[in-house]
Amino acid sequence: MKFVRPVSVIHTAHNLKGGLQLAEFAGRLCYKSEGKIKPGSYVKFLLMLIDKGHTSILEHCPIYVCGYHDMMSIEMINIRHSAFSRFVFDIKDARPDSHFYYIYTNLRVVYNESPELAKALIQTSTMEGDEIWKAHG
């Protein structure tokens, strides 16, 4: 067994990349491989865990989804109805013909509904903030 020097780390997930890094950190602790964390290593690590069926680690990555109901994909609508998702707001007055939702959930819920969407989020996570949404329409 290789001993890794202990450190104190406070992780915050203020964006998708931060959430994925948090999930990697939790997974690396589980597998006792903290010493392998490098910039960007979360992409390869999390995709490997998904391929092995260890998707519970994805619960450490919070996901915030917002948009009008009539513009959401069927996956997003199903995620909204998941028992693990939480509504923050349902603004009915923004557009009379469609509700605007803010949904808080985690990447495992997204994966369970659409593995392809979850993998795409992991692979595009090197972009920050609004760039992610601009790139995906």
Could you describe each region identified by the protein language model?
Residues 1-137:
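Family-specific signature for flavin-dependent thymidylate synthase
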